[in-house]
Amino acid sequence: MQTILGANGIIGEELARELRKNYCSDIRLVGRNPKKTHPDDQLFAADLLDIQNTIEALKNTEIAYLTVGLPYDSEIWLRDWQIIMKNVIEACKFNQCKLVYFDNTYAYLQNSIIQTETTPLACQGKKGRGKKLAATLLLKAIANKEIDAVICRAPEFYGPGKTKGLTNGMVFENLKNNKQPKVFLKDNVKRTPIFTPDASRAMALIGNTPDTYGQTWHLPCDDNRLTYNQFITEIEKQLGRTINFKILNYFTLKVGSFFNKNLKETLELLPRYAIDNIFDSSKFKTRFPNFKVTSYQEGIRIILNDFHIK
C-alpha cells in the first residue's frame, strides 16, 4: 500500500496516477474530502492536525507521501506545518512505513546564489519559517534514525490542469480569460519553474528507489532557463501572435496588497522575482540519467493546449 497525504492537489493527483501506472495498484488517498483519480483508489477522510486520524490514515502503508497544501496564510503555515510534520512522523513510526516529503523552496534565502540540496534553510519570512520548522523536524528524525524518509524539494510550479503558481495564474490564466498577462518586478531575470507532471513522476521514482532515502533531492527542471520575456516570446511563437504583457513594480504590488489578501501573502516572496532564481537539480539527473525532463517549450505547448488558448 502506498498512501498520499493531501491527495487532492495537482501534485497528489498526478502522483496517484503515476504510482498506479508504474509502481503500485494499492493506493490510498487521504484528505479532508478525498476524491478518486481511479475507480480502485481507497479513500480515507482525515485531518492531519489530529494525531489519531493520521495514524489511522497510514495503517498497512509501506510508503507515505506528504503532499498536503495549507491555505495561503502565513500564520497558518507558521502554526500548522510543524504540527502536521510531528503527527506524520509519529504515524510513520507507529505504522513502520517510509515517508516521502514534498517540500518547496520557501525556506531558502531569496538571493541569486545557486540553490542546491545543501542550501541552508535560513529564510526569515513567516511562510519560510513554517516550512523550515517542518523540514528541520524531519531532518532530525532522519538523523536519529527514527524514520526512513526522503525530502523532495521543488521550486515554483507551472503546468496543466489545476496547477497553482504565479506563472500559471498571472500568465496562462490571464491568456485563457482574454486578459493581459502580468509578471512581477522584472522580465529579464532567469526563472526555474518546475513542470508539475515532472515533479510527480520524479517523486514517485524517488519514493520507490530504496537508495534515495535519508537525503534531500531537488526535483528535476529544464536547465535551459528562461526569463519571463523569453517565456512569453515562446508563447507568442507558438500562438503566432503578439502578446502585450505588463510588469508590476513593487509600489503597485504593495498598494494592491491592501485590497487583495493573496497578494499580501505573496509580498514575502517578492525578492526572488527581482533576481536570477537558479534551482539546481543536477543531483537527480546524475542519479536518474534516463528521466526525461519536459523542456519549457514543450511544457508551454501542453499548457496552451490544455487551457485551449489560441
Give the location of each predicted region.
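Mid/C-terminal beta-alpha module of Rossmann-like enzyme folds, strongest
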Residues: Q2, A202-T266, S281, K292-Y296, ...
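N-terminal Rossmann NAD(P)H-binding glycine-rich loop of SDR-like oxidoreductase domains
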Residues: Q2-N22
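SDR active-site strand-loop-helix element
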Residues: L5, V30, T67-V68, Y101-N104, ...
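NAD(P)H-binding glycine-rich loop region in Rossmannoid oxidoreductase-like domains
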Residues: K35-N95
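Conserved Rossmann-fold NAD(P)-dependent oxidoreductase catalytic core, especially the SDR/UDP-sugar
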Residues: K86-K131
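Conserved beta-loop-beta element that borders a ligand/cofactor-binding pocket
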Residues: N104, T136-G161
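Glycine-rich "substrate-gating" loop/helix at the edge of Rossmann-like oxidoreductase active sites
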Residues: P155-G165, L185-P197, C221-D223
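A conserved pocket-lining segment of Rossmann-fold NAD(P)-dependent short-chain dehydrogenase/reductase
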Residues: E173-I194, I206, Y213
